[in-house]
Amino acid sequence: MTKDSTTTPAEAGKDWFTTYTVFARPQGEPGWLGLEGRDAKKAAKEFDEAVARVAQTGVTVRGVYDVSGMREAGDVMVWMYGQVPEDLQAAIRELRRTRLLEGTTMVLSAMGADRMAEFNKDHVPAFAMGRKALKWLCFYPFVRSYDWYLLDPKERARMLREHGQLGQDLSLIHI
């Protein structure tokens, strides 16, 4: 974020923004940064307190996921959402200062925008509808090229409908 940012909370509040941030612990470090017993409990409590602080700014930590063995360089992913991108950025910094993450390396950080669906206004992310987070997270970006917008709107609607139906039979996935 730069100091001359012109985004206001009212403008940013029109959409949801999400961040997916992956952290890796140092190679060869035993356990999680050498934390054991009471130290691990203190570190977890400190992290929970930081999560509560960022919640006061309008940022929700949707989940903390174990991604070890899923990515070459990554052990834990933090998924957050909010309506102001700068608040998400500040929340990442706040969480990184906790003992649980301070010795890690941020190996991936991506911000995305969840906007109103083009053809189905009722299609909103599960978190925006108040659904409880699940144990596993599966996501992918639906990136649209310039050519996408050259297609006839009816064809785009058909393709999106077909695309959305692909996951309907998967009971563990909330679309």
Residue ranges with predicted function:
Residues 1-56, 83-87, 107-171:
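Short S/T/G/P-rich N-terminal loop/turn motif that feeds into the first structured element of a domain
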Residues 47-88, 92:
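Long, hydrophobic/aromatic-enriched structural stretches that serve as scaffold segments
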Residues 95-103:
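A common structural junction motif
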Residues 173-175:
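Conserved small/polar residues in nucleotide/adenosyl-binding loops
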